[in-house]
Amino acid sequence: MDENGTVKPGYELKGLNSGNSRSNMDKDPIVSKFHRAGLNDSADEEDTDINGNRNTSWITSMISEEKRKVEGKSMLNDEEDLHLSKATLNKCDALVKILADIIKLEFVIHQSWYIRSLHKSVLIQFEVETSGGNKNSAGDSGDDDDDNHNGNLDDSFYKDLSLKCIKKCEKSSLALESLSRDIDQIRDFIMSNTIEDNRVDRLLQNSMTLLLECWIYSMKRLRRLRMKIAGIFVRSKLLLIDHELVTIWHFLQEQNEHETVNNENELKLAETIKSYRAFIKIFIQQLEDSESGSPSSSLFEECLHVFLDIESMYNSLNLNWLLNENKALQERLLSPSSTSENDHTNNLPVIDETKEIEDISSFVNSIVDASMLTHDLTPINSSDSDNLSNGEIDRLDGRRLSSSTSDMSLMMQRTSLQKQLPSLLTAFNNARRLEQELQNACKVNDNKHSTKDTDSNIRRNEHAMSSSVSSIISQNSTLASPSPPMSSSFISTAPSQSSSRMSTLPLSPSSSLLESQSQTLKNNMSQWLNQSRSGLNGTKLIPTNHIGFHSNVLNTLYGIGGGPVSKSYKSNQPSSQNT
């Protein structure tokens, strides 16, 4: 390639990888500058300088010089190659911006206080070096370091530091992914204009060579930055694992102090922590060696595989410990010798199903007996008894049930009969109602018998009164006019005045018998009026103001229009009485 960027005829592309061609390429001004700025040179240390623009200034100057050559059209004669060179140089500008972002991200990570503290804490914690900066072996640290570590075990500084560094690694990884996608677009541009177009000779042009060298340099910086972030993550995880192991060890120590159990697990975990720290000490040294070497070295990859093995072993140990701890906790909870469990058991009532059923039966029987006793002790007349509906009885029963003791409620809640108790109470209520109806039926039966006796007495009284009236009429047949009808005396008088009216009649031999029977009739009627008028069918008879007696027999006898009489009573009257 001459100064104008054209390929000489005698230059063969297949000899690019040979020693002579590489020596010739080292003489190229573009390639030689990138080789001198390689990652193994001291120029890499200048990338950590605060002035990030100075790190890419030498690349920017090369791009500007190449742009002036393209604008002057002094090295290209083809219009297509001129357009490609301009596009290639624009890609170089974009790649320089990506490289500047990579350098800034390196600077932020290098100057971060958390990451600096992490590196120092890992070296001290795993005894790679002491706080004075001298490296010591694991055996030289002695018991003093162990006491120092034990004094700082309760400190959560390492835990917080590790978590913050892991979070910073996550953010940096997201930024690296974005930068990697931008660099991949540059690679696709190079591939599409050289290999895919079968124009590999374009790689020998100054603009394409500059873009290719910038891309290779950026990829090396990006790979090294990934190694740094991965190393920070590995150190954070190792420090966090050490903190969690020590936390578990302290937990076992406290558990052994409060409980007289075997401390075998505590001793095993203490030995595990010692061996872990001794192993991590060697591992950290190898990790630092791999980071200081070439990014393409396989030593760093081997360190990553070792770290993955360590992490998987810790996860297995942690999971196994959690399972054992959970099992031991369940055994302690189920153990009858536990004090807290005994206290809890003593607070709970011991349930005996047989005694519980007896208590429930006696409880329901007491409710029924109290209800029956209330009905027996409280005098209720016929009208009040009729007005007491089934809904009111249910409300009374509900109030009685709500007044039961809390111990009974607790017992019913803890038994299997809880679901059946409402149906049992309903059955007892129905039984009580049936018993009341049977009692009412018995009362009506007694009333029927008394009514039959009354009817027989009334028929006897009727016969006697008829004979008396006949004798009176026959004895007073000499009067000019007959006496007024007897019914007129009953229209304006009450049944209670019948005795005085009948006392005005002339005396006869049967007057004493009539008077006694009249008194018996009044007593029977008074008893009848005071009794309940509800039959077996529950028909309610409301007394109304009417003229005459409540008996069709007397109304027929004295010629008075009868009042309302129950159907049950009418059905029992003989048809011969309605004369």
UniProtKB/Swiss-Prot annotation:
The keyword Methyltransferase does not apply. Residues 495-518 have a biased composition (Low complexity). Keywords: Phosphoprotein. The modification Phosphoserine is found at S42. GO terms for cellular component: cytoplasm; mitochondrion. The keyword Transcription regulation does not apply. GO terms for biological process: intracellular distribution of mitochondria; mitochondrial fission; mitochondrion inheritance; mitochondrion organization. Residues 1-27, 378-401, 446-518 are annotated as: Disordered. Residues 379-390 have a biased composition (Polar residues). Present with 414 molecules/cell in log phase SD medium. This is Mitochondrial distribution and morphology protein 36. It comes from Saccharomyces cerevisiae (strain ATCC 204508 / S288c).
